[in-house]
């Protein structure tokens, strides 16, 4: 009923609930229809061949997460795939965390592709998003072991999650949350620097009208 309401506020609430419901329906379909690698030993062997290369595996899975998110164009969908793979024991939590880092880069690249035909301000915002997340991935990779060990300690010892399948889901969620919160707390002090860098890379075009808020003096 909210979708057909004459009032814009109610209609917006209805559209929000409708879209949110479809998001979870899509995630449920992904989980239900995800291929079972245990029944496909060739594919499982292919995946596991690249899980024991040390830090090289971490870098590889960051790249895989980036490319996969660019193809799917939905970080929520790739996050669901990551949760399924870790919960079923196909990859470790550390490699799942690497996929999450890649997903954070991939979701910004899709925004940059969408902004190619937009105005200067939109392209600057998309580039700033990319810079923000790439910097976050770099510093987390430098502290990858301490960060993943800290998340594991929190979930296992503080939250006392016994079931491994549930624990790894909590770990990935906690890792994703920690990544974004810490990245904001670090980069909030460098907003001006990021702005200057982005404006230098993408200069103002003559045909673009400078954006101003209307009715606000």
Give the predicted meaning of each segment.
Residues 1-2, 31, 69-106, 115-117, ...:
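Membrane-interfacial helix-loop connectors
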Residues 18-21, 25, 66-72, 84-88, ...:
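Transmembrane helix-bundle signature of multi-pass membrane transporters/permeases
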Residues 38-53, 57, 148-169:
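Membrane-interfacial helical/loop segments at transmembrane boundaries in membrane proteins
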Residues 181, 188-217:
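Non-transmembrane accessory domains of multi-pass membrane transporters/channels
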């Amino acid at each position: 009923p909210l979708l057909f309401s004459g009032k814009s506020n109610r209609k917006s609430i209805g559209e929000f609930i409708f879209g949110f419901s479809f998001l979870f329906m899509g995630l449920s379909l992904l989980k239900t229809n995800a291929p079972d690698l245990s029944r496909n030993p060739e594919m499982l062997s292919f995946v596991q061949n690249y899980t024991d290369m040390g830090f090289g595996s971490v870098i590889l899975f960051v790249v895989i997460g980036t490319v996969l998110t660019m193809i799917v164009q939905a970080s929520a969908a790739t996050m669901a795939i990551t949760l399924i793979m870790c919960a079923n024991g196909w990859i470790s939590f550390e490699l799942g965390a690497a996929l999450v880092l890649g997903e954070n880069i991939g979701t910004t690249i899709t925004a940059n592709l969408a902004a190619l035909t937009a105005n200067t301000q939109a392209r600057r915002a998309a580039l700033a998003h990319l810079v923000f997340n790439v910097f976050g991935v770099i510093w987390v990779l430098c502290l990858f072991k301490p960060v993943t060990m800290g998340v594991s300690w929190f979930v296992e010892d503080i939250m006392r999650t016994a079931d491994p399948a549930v624990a790894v889901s909590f770990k990935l969620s906690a890792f994703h949350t920690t990544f974004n919160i810490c990245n904001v707390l670090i980069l909030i002090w460098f907003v001006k620097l990021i702005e200057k860098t982005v404006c230098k890379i993408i200069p103002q075009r003559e045909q673009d009208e400078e954006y101003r808020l209307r009715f606000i003096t």
